[in-house]
């Protein structure tokens, strides 16, 4: 695959209740600037339901060409945030 690919600056782990939970945020990352927080569970990426996807599947959905825009929805303390 040719081109530059990038992530959003998060580390994931399997969530206790399922899904993929943010375990760490890179300082100064796009994710941190967008307001994501440790403990958020990623449930949608670009309107694709990832609530029961593996950590690897969620990580793959978050990777893309540098500068690409992603729309995320997360669960934060049981409340959906977009």
Feature names for model-found ranges:
Residues 20, 30-32, 51, 80-81:
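Short beta-strands and strand-coil junctions in structured, solvent-facing domains, enriched
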Residues 4-6, 38, 54, 58:
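Generic hydrophobic, aliphatic-rich segments that mediate packing or membrane embedding
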Residues 1-24:
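PDZ/PDZ-like peptide-tail recognition elements
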Residues 6-8, 34, 66:
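Short glycine-rich loop/turn motifs that provide flexible caps or phosphate-binding loops at active sites
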Residues 31-54:
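Conserved PDZ fold ligand-binding element
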Residues 21, 43, 57-82:
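PDZ-domain C-terminal substructure recognizer with occasional recognition of PDZ-binding tails
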